[in-house]
C-alpha cells in the first residue's frame, strides 16, 4: 500500500512512519509513504500557496493550482489508481467500516488543509471523498490524516504482529472491547477477575462477550440499536438489563 500526504509540514509524519507498529511495517516494506509539499508547485519564487478570500473574511485560503499540481504529481508515483481524501470537519465521520474499506485500496492520497480552508474548486475537481475525525476543529489536516492512517494500516495484513489484535478491538465486532488485565494479580485492592485465571477458554470467551455487551450498553447504547444480535448476545444482554433494573428498583 502506498499512502501519500499533500502537506506543508512533511516532518509531522515522522511519528507514524518511524515509530510503533506502523513504523516497523514501513521499514519492512509492507506500506510506503511519501509527503508531497505543495510549496514545491507554487508559481512564485517564495512558495506562497495561500491568498486572501474573495468576499472578505478572516484568514487565508489555500490556492487550487499548487494543490492540484501536488495531487497530480502524487498520482504519477504509482501505477495503481489513487483515492484522494480531504481531511475536513465537514466530511463524513471516520468509522471502523470506512477504515476496513480503505485498507483494501492500494493507493491513498491524503490532502491536509491549513489556514482557513481550501479553494472549493480544488475540492470539486480533485477530491474523491471528505472524511472527518469528529465534530471539532484542529489547526490542520496532518493529525487527522495520521489518525486515519493508523486506523487503516492496522487492518493491513502484516502490520500488526497478530491480526487477532485488530479483530478484537472495539468496533471490529460492532461493540466495544472488553476490559483487559495483566500482572500483578492485585493492584490497589483490585484483583484480576477469577474467570480470567481459570484456564477455561469457554467461560473466558463468554465473560469477555458479556463484558463487551455491558460496556456497550452503558457507554454506547446506539451501537446495540444497529446490531443484529445472535441468541447468546440477546440472552446475555437481557441478563445485564435485568441486573440494572434490580439495582434501580
Curated annotation (Swiss-Prot):
A molecular function GO annotation: tRNA (guanine(37)-N1)-methyltransferase activity
Subcellular location(s) of the protein: Cytoplasm
Gene3D superfamilies documented for this protein: 3.40.1280.10, tRNA(m1g37)methyltransferase, domain 2
Top EC class of this enzyme: transferase
GO cellular component: cytosol
Subunit structure: Homodimer.
PANTHER family: TRNA (GUANINE-N(1)-)-METHYLTRANSFERASE
Entry protein name: tRNA (guanine-N(1)-)-methyltransferase
Amino acid at each position: 500500500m502506498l499512502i501519500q500526504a499533500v502537506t506543508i509540514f512533511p516532518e509531522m509524519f515522522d511519528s507514524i512512519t518511524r515509530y510503533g507498529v506502523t513504523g516497523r511495517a514501513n521499514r519492512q516494506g509492507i506500506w510506503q509513504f511519501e509527503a508531497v509539499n505543495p510549496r514545491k508547485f507554487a508559481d512564485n519564487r517564495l512558495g506562497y500557496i495561500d491568498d486572501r478570500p474573495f468576499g472578505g473574511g478572516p484568514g487565508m485560503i489555500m490556492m487550487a493550482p499548487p494543490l492540484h499540481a501536488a495531487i497530480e504529481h502524487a498520482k504519477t508515483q504509482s501505477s495503481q489508481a489513487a483515492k484522494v481524501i480531504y481531511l475536513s470537519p465537514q466530511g463524513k465521520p471516520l468509522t471502523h467500516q470506512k477504515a476496513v474499506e480503505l485498507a483494501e485500496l492500494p493507493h491513498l492520497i491524503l490532502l491536509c488543509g491549513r489556514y482557513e480552508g481550501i479553494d472549493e474548486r480544488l475540492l470539486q475537481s480533485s477530491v474523491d471523498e471528505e472524511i472527518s475525525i469528529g465534530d471539532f476543529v484542529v489547526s490542520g489536516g496532518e493529525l487527522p490524516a495520521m489518525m486515519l492512517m493508523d486506523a487503516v494500516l492496522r487492518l493491513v495484513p502484516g502490520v500488526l504482529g497478530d491480526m487477532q489484535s485488530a479483530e478484537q478491538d472495539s468496533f471490529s465486532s460492532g461493540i466495544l472491547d472488553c476490559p483487559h488485565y495483566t500482572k500483578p494479580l492485585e493492584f490497589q485492592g483490585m484483583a484480576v477477575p477469577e474467570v480470567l485465571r481459570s484456564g477455561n477458554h469457554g467461560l473466558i470467551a463468554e465473560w469477555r462477550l458479556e463484558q463487551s455487551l455491558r460496556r456497550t450498553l452503558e457507554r454506547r447504547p446506539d451501537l446495540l440499536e444497529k446490531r443484529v444480535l445472535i441468541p447468546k448476545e440477546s440472552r446475555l444482554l437481557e441478563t445485564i438489563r435485568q441486573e440494572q433494573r434490580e439495582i434501580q428498583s
